[in-house]
Amino acid sequence: MQIQIVCVGKIKDAYISSGVVEFEKRLRPYGKIFITELAEVKIPDNASASDELRVKEREGELILANVKEGFFKIALDPNGMSLSSEEFSDVFRDAKLSGKNLCFIIGGPLGLSPKLLQSVEKKLSLSRMTFTHPMTRLILLEQVYRAFRILNGEPYHK
Ligand SMILES: C[S@@+](CC[C@H](N)C(=O)[O-])C[C@H]1O[C@@H](n2cnc3c(N)ncnc32)[C@H](O)[C@@H]1O
């Protein structure tokens, strides 16, 4: 199975980057995981709500242009569905059984556009609280790792 994570914006904090590198390494035995990091679209000074919407829409277009052909799209969204870690591991079991590849999408500082959120197959919430986009990347990777450990009956999840 291939897993793509498309995200907008760089990680600036070393403590998050090293966590991301660690979980990418731990995930290597379970499939091809690759991260597509896109540059943030510049937010104009004193941006109005419509300027911000334009930024999110442009980022949404760039995201969709970078999703690998045929991948099942899951957007990370605080208002999406919430799953237990066991239920999240079922997402990978089902994808494996049906031969699907998955693409997780993380927005930039302004979030994802309504158009993008309408175009994806699923929306996943990690919590009703809002995280920074780098933190979301790290938490998602840890949960993907946890899901594979659960799926394979390997120790980690308690
Ligand atoms: C700083 S947040 C954007 C906040 C923005 N106000 C919004 O409504 O999406 C950046 C990105 O991180 C992801 N994110 C943040 N918190 C999340 C959560 N609790 N669950 C899922 N994704 C989250 C989303 O993909 C979001 O677009």
Curated annotation (Swiss-Prot):
GO terms for molecular function: rRNA (pseudouridine-N3-)-methyltransferase activity. The keyword Transcription does not apply. GO terms for cellular component: cytoplasm. It is found in: Cytoplasm. Its main location: cytoplasm. It is an enzyme of class 2 (transferase). It comes from the Archaea. S-adenosyl-L-methionine binds at residues 76, 107, 126-131. It catalyses: pseudouridine(1915) in 23S rRNA + S-adenosyl-L-methionine = N(3)-methylpseudouridine(1915) in 23S rRNA + S-adenosyl-L-homocysteine + H(+). The keyword Glycoprotein does not apply. Specifically methylates the pseudouridine at position 1915 (m3Psi1915) in 23S rRNA. Its EC number is 2.1.1.177. Keywords: Cytoplasm, Methyltransferase, rRNA processing, S-adenosyl-L-methionine, Transferase. Belongs to the RNA methyltransferase RlmH family. It comes from Methanocorpusculum labreanum (strain ATCC 43576 / DSM 4855 / Z). This is Putative ribosomal RNA large subunit methyltransferase H. InterPro entries: Alpha/beta_knot_MTases, RlmH-like, tRNA_m1G_MTases_N.
